């Protein structure tokens, strides 16, 4: 009647039956201080929507921290997890300049360049957006180490994955376009030929 295939009909039925579970999950997330920002919200990052367009921009993001950071001018510093000293020094210099120019630093919280970018942003009194390769509720150790920065409004943590999704390499690769999409400028400190930077 509505031009829906049998497969789509089954999917709709399954989705309908799972709605109560998602309602409880959303309520639980809100009680824990997380925010859910759909692509239709004015709080959704404009840069992400403009860079990835509606075709690729995630329809929903999960955040914790100062959501005003989502609308500020930002740069991304990306590179190898096994970055050498020169690359980490380069990252530190770029981060320092970004803080001076009042730009947000977007990073992925991986070791190497990502972690250096975040640490330098904090060291120089700047602000940062951390884009997770996992669900936002599985980042408990990270929330503990960044507690002071999150509370003070200097760091926002963001995920586009199911809130309970554990880290895996596939999510780490899928996270990278979000980092690029969040930034107006991208600096590559070091990239391995077999790595996941690109």
For each feature predicted by the language model, list its residue ranges.
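Short, small/acidic-rich helices and loops at N termini and domain boundaries
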Residues: 1-43
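Glycine-biased, small-residue-rich flexible motifs in mid-sequence functional cores and linkers
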Residues: 31-32, 39-198
